[in-house]
Amino acid sequence: MKQTPQIRLVFTLTKRDGTDFERDAVTRGLGISPTRSCPPTPGKGKVQHSGKEIREPDEQVLPGFTVLPAEAPPYPTLRHAYWSAELPKMDCRALDEPLQQLEQMLCGKEAEVRRLCEEYSLYADLTVRVFAASNDLPELVLPDGSVAFWASVGATVSFDFYLD
């Protein structure tokens, strides 16, 4: 029996410099309770090798983490502080339904998201997580209205695929 693909959308505001921010102010400003919210925390794992010696904190090696300098590998990591609003996994054959749902949640709050990002030096991200068989992916179309909406929020859009 074929399984319907699933999509989960995650909107995240992240502080990438190793410091915390007023996550409660984000909740108040947006009027949305976060699904998850976390201060900077030490990563559980360590980076064995990044192809170069790490002498200063490096955010480019591992998304969501800063790799901290050390005398030699393994390098410790620090998970960035973040605030996120996630939709539950949805069985769907196209991205449009969950995308519209998240956009409705944030509609009218675009300027507030940009203000919070500026005030607290945050990065806005929309992550589209797709759970599917490799030969049964959903339709992943970003209509022009959605592209304009996420651009107005200042969000980077990325896709994570979890394939069977």
Label each residue range with its predicted role.
Residues 1-148, 152-162:
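Acidic (Asp/Glu-rich) sequence patches and key acidic residues
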